[in-house]
Structure formats: structure tokens, C-alpha cells
Amino acid sequence: MDSATGGNDAGTPTARVPGGEGEPHSPYRDARLGCTDKKLKAGVTAEGSAPGALGSPSQRTPGVKVMDPARGPQKQLPRPCLVLVLLNPRGGKGKALQLFRSHVQPLLAQADVSFRLMLTERQNHARELVRAEELGRWDALVVMSGDGLMHEVVNGLMERPDWETAIRKPLCSLPAGSGNALAASLNHYAGYEQVTDEALLNNCTLLLCRRQLAPVSLLSLRTRSGLRIFSMLSLAWGFVADVDIESEKFRRLGEMRFTLGTLLRLVTLRVYRGRLAYLPVEQAVSKAPAASPPLDRQDRQGPVDAHLVPLEEPVPAHWTVVPEQDFVLVLVQLHSHLGSEMFVAPMGHRVAGAMHLFYVRAGVSRATLLRLFLAMEKGRHMEYNCPYLVYVPVVAFRLEPKDGKGMFAVDGERMVSEAVQGQVHPNYIWMVSGRGDPSPAPEPQWPPPSRKPQQTPPPEVSL
């Protein structure tokens, strides 16, 4: 869902972005990017800085580390700070670059946030970039797209030889895709009202300007075929995954694609047979594992999944096993929102050290399921006390689809349907968030004050 290309469309070459710092309304802002210039295709990027000459390099000395690897980052980004912005120009409605110039760049200028802008060209481009990037140059990585691009960034960081240090680089989510669940959750944690589109982007940009950091959890997933995947948001199987993946063809509608996809899927409601097991929070606390299980002894690329045993073995005796049956959906959720208007986990901002497990058993009527999803906008779906809907806070789970039926969606990205298990790692990643001590820095103004045009015109770009 809105990864590097927002699908499999041809990507846009990484190009120098015209239009100066603080000049979102310059005559160059509508310049097209799809040029054939070899230098642009080689990956020229845009640089901006808080008030100064157009395109001037940042004042930060290159190569200076901005965090202590032994302690990780502090609770606040420095002022001024330098960030790397990874932006998918084709995600969602295809307006991310325009939104960056008009909504994000002016606020960053006021807040002394310098940036370098890189446009992704294809699926997994962001993953490749962060895998090879010299992270010590940046105070934070800013991801402007949907949830899929953040998924790429996190997995790219976890694939680095220095993953233990790399994953502690602060991350920031700026919504510009069709799926913006992580940004909506951070907006909720900051105490803002539930909003969408440009209003959500404004709120998340203000969070970056305030520089506050908060730790969030990471979900480690392992499949029967040996894949290890890391998730920032969710794993879905059944109805939610079907809607997420099958509505990709409507992604130009933005988040309306999910409403349309839900209605279409309700017409022909599917059920999937499988087995589910999970480790409830209370059992994890009372019966913590004494040692690392065998599956981690030869896998040191990532944190130890101490609650998991190999998929070939039965789950431990203190786990809860749901008998094999037909499910409409299974959803494992780390955060409050599944979309900007889907308040799926109103039980609390974040369950400390846990994740939300929902499943809906077969037998639920289409009308009831529709009512649940409509009530989810305000987080009131649990008030229905629907006997087919089950919710449990867990720290680990195992899900085994029968005969590989159905689709998995991890952070909105399709994953092969096979047996999978996962464990949450609490407070593992630092995110720009509204949770923390108030910043002494002045609040950026929105709309930003008008600024005099730069005297030096922006550089010419071959189109």
C-alpha cells in the first residue's frame, strides 16, 4: 500500500526539485519530473535549508553523528536539525511532491529544519537507499508517502550490518498516500482531533517542527518458508487484507479506496479456515521464557524473539489455542488506527509491551459487519458487543491458514499466504511524536507568513 511506487507503475526519476526554500508558490512548482536527462536519472536530489540562500547546503558538518549509539537518541531532535526526506511522488493521489512544497517546506523553514529531499523511483527503492545511506549525516529520516514506504524504510534499516544502531535513528511519518494509519495514530497520540488529508499532514508536520520523540513498538514476523519481516503497524488476514490489496486499483481515490473496497467485498463475503494461537499479556508476564528458543540461535539479524518456538513445533503450553475454524478476518494491530478514519483500537493510546489482536468468526452477517466498520470511524465498534468479534491484548501469536487460502497484508503490503508467527518488541523505534515534554521552541505558524521572493532564480531543470 503506497510503497515506493504506490503499486507497480513506472517510477519517476529522482530529480532536483525546483522551487526554493520557502517559495512554494514559485512559477517552477508545477515543473514535471519525468525527464530523460541522464544526470537526473542518476539520482540528483533536492536540498533545502531553513532561511538562507536557495538550495544552499546545510550548515551541519557532514558525517557528524547525531546520537550516541550506546544510549540511542535523546527525547528531542536538536535545533537546528538536518533530516533526509524520502518521498514517493506517485503514492496516493500522486500529489505528494506538490503537498511537500505547499504544506511542509514552509513550516520546516520556520522551525530551522534543514532537509535533503530524495524521490523514490520504484518499489523497494527506499529500502535500498536506507540500507546504503550514511545515517550519521542525519538527525532523522522523514518518510512522506503512505504506510508502505515506512515499511520499506524499517526493513531496510533492519537489513544493515549495523542494524542495532540504525534502527534507533528517529523516524517521522508525513502522510501523503492512500493508507496513512501510522500518521493517524501519531496524530491521535498527540491529542489532535481525528482529521484526514491536508489537515493530517499539517498536524504531522507540526510534530516534526516540535522535535519531540517517543518510542514505539516493532513487530517481528517469521513465516514457514523462512522469511523474517518487520512491521510498524499491522498484519491482516481475511477481510481487511482483501480490501487493502484488492483496492490498490482505486488508489487514486486516496483513502476513499478503502470505503469502496469494503462495500465491494461485503457483496461477496469470504471466509477462510485456519488455526490461531496467541500469548495473552498476563500469561507473558507470569511465564516469561527462561532462555532464547532454538530458532534464534542462528539468526542474529534482528532482535531475539524469545516467546517464539519453531513453526514446526506446537506452541508452548501457556499459550491460548483457538480451535481450527472459519474466520472472516484476523488482525494484529500495533497502533490505534488502521486508516485515517479507522479508529480500530480505542482501548488506549498504546498497550504497553503488547499489541491488539482482533478476529471475527464466520457467521457474522453482512449488515453487522458493515455496522462494525462504520462505527470504527469513531472507535465505537466495541460497544456493539458483537459475539463474533473477539479482542485480546497479546505479545505473540501464530496464524496458520489452511491450504494457504487468503491473503496477508503487512503494513498494507501483500505477503505470501503461509503459516506465520510474530512477537512484539516494545519501545524499539524512536518516532517523531507529540508525546513528550513541551518544546521550548516557538510554534510554527499555519498558514506560514508570506516571504519575499528569492532574488536568485532556481536552477534550470531539463524536462
Predicted regions, residues:
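Eukaryotic basic, amphipathic alpha-helical target segments in cytosolic regions
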Residues: 108-116, 134-138, 149, 161, ...
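Eukaryotic intrinsically disordered and solvent-exposed regulatory patches
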Residues: 67-73, 127-129, 138, 160, ...
